[in-house]
């Protein structure tokens, strides 16, 4: 049994194994594939709205022969009555062979892991991480570009709150990626992520426009500006239309084999006139969520046995009840946690939401 909480907890070999298993399952005989998780139950608990992630996990479960329980509206669950996340996870575990959870609180998935032995897949926790999106992004990059080694990726839009950006950066770090973060200052990439990149000697630049790097990059990764992450509506209004791309500013101005990805949903950041160009891979990317999530579920439950060694985390974790995470959207402010702190050579970080302590 294993959990998929953070892409940081996977080794390069484990990532490659997930992608290889996803490819095998995508090409497998459907009748044989339905035997893999026959008799198992997946419970999906979504505390935030979702279309692609929730439906692709459901599709993945059915294709593996797995039954599904769950909710996608916490208003229709005991959460509305005041039930804690701790109690929700404990109860759901009693009915499940695997839990898929999305939550609005940063670090919720890491906390859930502490209170159950049931395998958990993090389907997005606030502005923190989204490992299943990262793995399907890596799968798409490998399928479309032939490799995920040494790719130059420009992240455009909301790099501050974009959990898909944060997780994909962590994933591509293993493969010597090079990054461009293109955002208005108010939604630019957080310093705690840049500290990780600096420590790993990964090349990156913060820029205010994407045009200057179109001839260099292998992938243009667009994101929407997320209204739900802003406390100040005025900040959102100032930046919500910061970047828009169309045929006029892409075709003939980028590398011939560059691809455009987007975790979706899009608002107006990608004009539909790009949809039928060779650069647009975002709908293929969304489709790739099914085989990737099949692989994650099968490996998490040991329905398919992993053949690679589990990554050993080489940092110290301590419990410190006196430490307060500076992120007011961290699970430590909503649940009774063990208040763990990760001690690294370049700083102390919240075990749950990854924010630097003391910043």
UniProtKB/Swiss-Prot annotation:
Coiled coil: none
Pathway membership: Pyrimidine metabolism; UMP biosynthesis via de novo pathway; (S)-dihydroorotate from bicarbonate: step 2/3
Catalytic reaction equation(s): carbamoyl phosphate + L-aspartate = N-carbamoyl-L-aspartate + phosphate + H(+)
Residues reported to bind carbamoyl phosphate: 52-53, 102, 130, 133, 264-265
UniProt keyword annotations, A-Z: Pyrimidine biosynthesis, Transferase
One annotated GO biological process: 'de novo' pyrimidine nucleobase biosynthetic process
Single GO term (MF): amino acid binding
Signal sequence bounds: none
Binding site for L-aspartate: 81, 163, 224
InterPro entries: Asp/Orn_carbamoyltranf_P-bd, Asp/Orn_carbamoylTrfase, Asp/Orn_carbamoylTrfase_sf, Asp_carbamoyltransf, Asp_carbamoyltransf_Asp/Orn-bd, Asp_carbatrfase_reg_C_sf
EC number: 2.1.3.2
Pfam entry (one): OTCace_N
GO cellular component, one term: cytosol
Family: Belongs to the aspartate/ornithine carbamoyltransferase superfamily. ATCase family.
Function field: Catalyzes the condensation of carbamoyl phosphate and aspartate to form carbamoyl aspartate and inorganic phosphate, the committed step in the de novo pyrimidine nucleotide biosynthesis pathway.
Assembly, per entry: Heterododecamer (2C3:3R2) of six catalytic PyrB chains organized as two trimers (C3), and six regulatory PyrI chains organized as three dimers (R2).
NCBIfam families, per database record: asp_carb_tr (TIGR00670), PRK00856.1 (NF002032)
Protein name in the entry: Aspartate carbamoyltransferase catalytic subunit
Species whose genome carries this gene: Brachyspira hyodysenteriae (strain ATCC 49526 / WA1)
Gene field: pyrB
